[in-house]
Amino acid sequence: MRHYIAIIVLFFQAHFISAQSVGKWSFSSQQLPVYEYTGRLPNIVLDKLGKDSYIQTDPYFLLGNYRLSLFVHASGIYQFMTGERAWARVNADENQQNYGSNNAQIIVKKGKNYKKTDLIGLKSIAIDTQRTQKLFGVGFAKYTYRLDEDLSCQRVISVKPSTKINTGNPAFVVSVTLKNSGKVVQELTYSEGMKLNYTPSAIQLYEPTKRPVSYLHKISVDKSTKTTIANLTCTPNLFLNFPSKNQRYIYDVNPPNVFMSTKSFDKDIKSYITVNHDTLSAHLTTILKPGETHTFHIIVGLNYENSKQAIQEQINELLANVNPSNNNEGFYQTAWKKQLPDFTAEKDQIIKREMLWNAYTLEAMATYCAYYGETIIPQGTIYAYHFGDNISNRDHLQAALPVCYTNPNLAKSIIRYVIMHSETDGEIKRGDAGNGCTPPSLYKESDEQLYFFNTLSQYLASTKDYAFLNEKVWLYPAENKKGEVVLNILKNYFVYLRDEIGRGSNGLVKMLNSDWSDSFFHENSPNVYAATAESHLNSVMVLAIFPKLITELKKSKNPEATALIIALENYRKEVSEAYFKDFGNRKFSARAYLNHRKKYGIDNVCIEPQGYLLQIPDLSISRKKEIYQYVKSKIYSPEKIGFRTREKPLWSTTGEGEDGGIWFSLEGSLIAGVATFDKQEAKELLHTISFQNFTDQYPSIWLGQWTGGDNVNSTLSQRDGLCFFWEKDRPNVFQGFCSHPHAWPLYCYLKIKE
């Protein structure tokens, strides 16, 4: 009986105690967003039926630059990740996927006794909300611990921004400040360690003894510089034929070196480095007199040069021009301020805060890919951070849309990266895994070229960089260094769209085996329907995007574009005639015709094509308003945070995921469509998909209050407010920080402001 009572108590605690908000926002001294996490730890989130949410119980934020990704948890745990050669955790926790292994403790001498306090983890002082404050801002995380009435410890993690494409310092600083507010001397030792366990995301799903490769390390300690360096090597556990380090490969055969160093500008602090098996640790011992404050710094990072001198230069660069005693908001607030757009004029404080946060998050997510020599914004979430895949290229192209305004060089790098996945016939590979490896895929996507046209059009419109059309970019595989000028690649993309993807019996653009929806054929075999399936979404994308592309090509005044412009205009006209013949006097677009009998979205509103339908420039405003009001009446109410994908599910009973959920990429395209005829309504919709509105609607669900996945379940589901996650046997591992809930709101905001 006691067992059942305990379960009931936990259930009600999870539902009712957590019904309060888990934190609050403010602004830093540089007027950048800061979030204070005040929720409980562990933060257990359940659905309406009391079932597991799959969300981690230790909420996390993201610090990063183009060469490192650092997920900092509310408990002080961090996941130190790199995506430079392959997505991998440097300090992976073998007991829990998508989690890190690090520790910190402080030992205070009390007479002849010693009192030890653990600072990090779900069994530490961090779970005590009365004794620990947790702040997460732009480029920093700050944990303040009240050890007793007189002694406090502040631990600040700082990440320096990248200011140029393909560059950045892949290291972070942990600054520890100890303060004695009492009247007696305090003698203490502080220690902080990180377990070295380099584990690519793609192989974390294997049991350690069954992994195809292992990463071994040889550790050395340089006492003179107080630095320890771990040289990593990749070793096969079964027969493999390793390539050279610069060739594409599913595994990273050239992992980085990992280092930890300690630095103090305070002569009263004794600091040193130790190694215990696979754990790198930094320590300080000091005596704090009444009223004294002592600070020391730990630098943890990656280095690819296998050089002690290079590591010291990296450390020096990280600490150059910083005030070591002024780290209350991290070391790099001023640098981050310069890197982000200026939204000072925005009077709506929620929108101002969230757009700054979104711009920062995209910069923190952006990742240099060594194989391609380009920097991208990955889709992130479970794709990159859980499975280790940079998929799909259409997602990277969508993430590039807002940075066409905020960081055009980054947008250009993303466009170049996508081109490097292209065959000479105009096919664009879906994405890659490992170090530039493109594994065989069951998907033959029909829309990559359309998303490319959209992003290139926006880039050209924003930058007027028409010379880009004459630049040469490597084609697939990039290591062969065989390239073509962008304009010719653009021509190949169009020919591929027209001839390989083609159009069906109704004159609509075909679907092949997937358009935006990867799941559309889960219930319908592509072997049966791929030859006939037509996509209304692809068709309206042509009608919405081609006019923009044609306009920019004309503005380029490039004589080599003349024939392409004519071909684009003719194709757009043909698709327009076919689409509007099918559309007739309907009040919403159909979704797809798999053949002449199997038609979807005829009497059931599906969101996918509606946003691009509203973006078609020669569709009258009165018709757009009529369409929008009807669509809104069918899939907006009674939703709390946006439009769901379906009026009624097409193939499922739960109405989750692509068959009834709320998807930020679709919300964004719809808002962009509404902005073409009613900017005030578009602003209101922007508030609807905001993190603040999610917090108001779902205060107990932390994932969605400052980041999220690519989707959220709608009210059709018993799990509304939660992300759809198909890995049912992997509880508490869902990794957020998808680019879409950051990129699309920011892009829509910038479009509305035009």
Where are these regions (language model features)?
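Active-site acid/base region of carbohydrate-active enzymes
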Residues: Q130-F136, E346-A364, T406-N409, V418, ...
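Acidic-aromatic substrate-binding/catalytic surfaces of carbohydrate-active enzymes
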Residues: Y60-D128
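Beta-strand-rich recognition/accessory modules
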Residues: A171, Y251-N328, Y529-T532, I545
